[in-house]
Amino acid sequence: MQFKQDFFTQLPEFYSQVYPQGLSHPQWLAWSHDAAQLIGLTQPTDELLLGLSGNAAIDGATYYAQVYSGHQFGGYTPRLGDGRSIILGEAIGPNGAWDVALKGGGPTPYSRHGDGRAVMRSAVREFLVSEALYHLHVPTTRALAVIGSDMPVWRESQETAAITVRLARSHIRFGHFEFFCHSERGRADKLLQLLNFTITQHYPHLSCDPSGYKAWFLQVVQDTAKMIAHWQAVGFAHGVMNTDNMSILGDSFDFGPFAFLDTFQEDFICNHSDPEGRYAFGQQPGVGLWNLQRLAQALTPVIPSDDLIAILNQYQEALVQTYLLLMRAKLGLTTLDKSTAEQDKQDLELIGQFTVLMEKNQLDYAQTWRQFGQLDPRSQHSSLRDDFIDTHQFDTWYKAYQLRLGDVTDIAAWQTERNSVNPKYILRNYLAQEAIIAVEEGNLAPLQRLQQVLSQPFAEQVEHDELAKRPPDWGQGLIMSCSS
């Protein structure tokens, strides 16, 4: 790997230098060839294993943990930072640079009495979801690899330590800006330095002046809205949408007790540490705006409040338009025959009515959408109908859907298009759990198989049909722990 060190050299007050503590008896558990290509790598090697497990220095790496703060479950925590993630620098790839981070690399000055380690189960989950979201076309950070070990660590019980090697276009979070506004009062110079660095590195088409700052914040608002719209369309619940887990670039980031929906449930909670459902699936769009408002508060020293409010008011439109684009594709609604505002309203109602029916009839979210690839929309008797207990309500909705859809002349092409946007395979929690159990038993084959299947989520892959089935009773709607 070839590194540059722009963050390290230009922002010395934004991190602490710290070196990883090596894993004992490291071994490759997972490797993403797609992600490896981003930074010019091909195969996992013994030399790379030693370096990424913290047992040998990597040429050009600097090793540091970033400092930031954030709002966690609505309350401000003035000092957080990378408690178990150590960044090596920005690896230069064929199409740009990517931060390389060792998540689970050992304690840092921000570990807050923690051991700085990640357990194998959380490392595998983060790897799988990073790559699964990417192949579902959801904006996300990436995962290069998982490195296992025989090092014992204690959570609720004894587990083994592992490292997820994360790739990110940037590790700058909303919480970085909050830290230098709230926790380090009187350091507006540092806030401005961070803002100028972010724009120069990631928004080079913008200028570092008042007009450029406003254009940048608008881009952040729109990118965040688009990311969350993708979550809602694909049925993804993040679980811990604290502001320190929000990427400034609008990439899905810092995965913990996440879940993809099994049966559709608007108020689904995937995190057992969130009993009130602050971060429930249906709350995510509102939380996204709330988090952006906290970011806006941190930016008041450099952007006038009136401008920030005006830009925040554009969040809803960006969210709705992206969501409509994605959901129209899932339904095959490709024509607009009325004024945009009126059609948008009617389409949102049509989509909302369908998801309400899905929830009322306890239908599997992914499987139901996938059936549109076998649907003949010209037929008066939908193949979907038998899945609904309340067939009368479905018939009413289906007539409205057919009316909105209009004429479909090439059924085969229409069905192929539906299958290209409605995945057959998603990362169900029970599948991840089965793969983790197999790894614990020394068997990597189920993990490798799951990774391969999730890299082609829209393909039929009939030999893997069982991975598309609804979960067994024990795996339905699993709620995960934050411990990792």
Curated annotation (Swiss-Prot):
Residues annotated to bind Mg(2+): 245, 254
> Record's InterPro entries?
SelO (IPR003846)
Q: Which cofactor does it need?
A: Mg(2+); Mn(2+)
A Pfam family cross-referenced in the UniProt record is: SelO
Annotated catalysed reactions: L-seryl-[protein] + ATP = 3-O-(5'-adenylyl)-L-seryl-[protein] + diphosphate; L-threonyl-[protein] + ATP = 3-O-(5'-adenylyl)-L-threonyl-[protein] + diphosphate; L-tyrosyl-[protein] + ATP = O-(5'-adenylyl)-L-tyrosyl-[protein] + diphosphate; L-histidyl-[protein] + UTP = N(tele)-(5'-uridylyl)-L-histidyl-[protein] + diphosphate
Please tell me where ATP binds in this chain: 81, 83-84, 103, 115-116, 166, 173, 254
Which residues participate directly in catalysis?
A: 244
Per the UniProt entry, the signal peptide is none
Q: Does the keyword Magnesium apply?
A: yes
EC identifiers of the protein: 2.7.7.-, 2.7.7.108
Keyword entries, A-Z:
ATP-binding, Magnesium, Manganese, Metal-binding, Nucleotide-binding, Nucleotidyltransferase, Transferase
GO MF entries: AMPylase activity; ATP binding; magnesium ion binding
Keyword Lipid biosynthesis attached: no
- State the similarity comment: Belongs to the SELO family.
Function (record text)? Nucleotidyltransferase involved in the post-translational modification of proteins. It can catalyze the addition of adenosine monophosphate (AMP) or uridine monophosphate (UMP) to a protein, resulting in modifications known as AMPylation and UMPylation.
Protein's name in the database: Protein nucleotidyltransferase YdiU
**Which gene codes for it?**
ydiU
